[in-house]
């Protein structure tokens, strides 16, 4: 049987900041429709690796390919153009703008006004499209003119994910998506990620919350001292198992 082609492949990825080596020779394949959790203690190299995948940083060594074709991400826009979107912990939302304005920030829709060469914002279409994206996520948000600052933490995550859908992202990187959220809001975010998976999206999850990882991940990658030392299906692993694996990796790196 022919093995499926990875959606994203990293080969020999390294990242250095002067004399500091943050990522060391990482090989990683990400397949369509899976949730991959990247775990590790502080300083393990997770954030630096994600910055390379998201285009925020260029690798110091190694190669990236999408569906077997070499690519280079010199900026987050390059990554977006190839279908890779990142939702950071702070969500990068403008709190005083409306839901629709946030979903379409940087890619606003326009329509002709009076003369063919004059264009104005197509607010009605942006509201309708924003509602469609949020409905895809089964998010209980109905008023697209509502300022984001009036939303709950889970609802804000839904807006940030909708913006990634607006960019037609195939891979959505989520950095600590439940950090600082209560139990109810965390459950909402977990449901949003499950919905992304059921719709065929690929999610790369960075989390220190092993319970979230166990609840969501198909596969777990554990890093330590810049290296990938675990890459396996989640299977029957528990949150305690993952914690022990991270600690064991720290001991090896020490």
Describe each region flagged by the PLM.
Residues 2-254:
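Glycine-rich phosphate-binding loops of nucleotide-dependent enzymes
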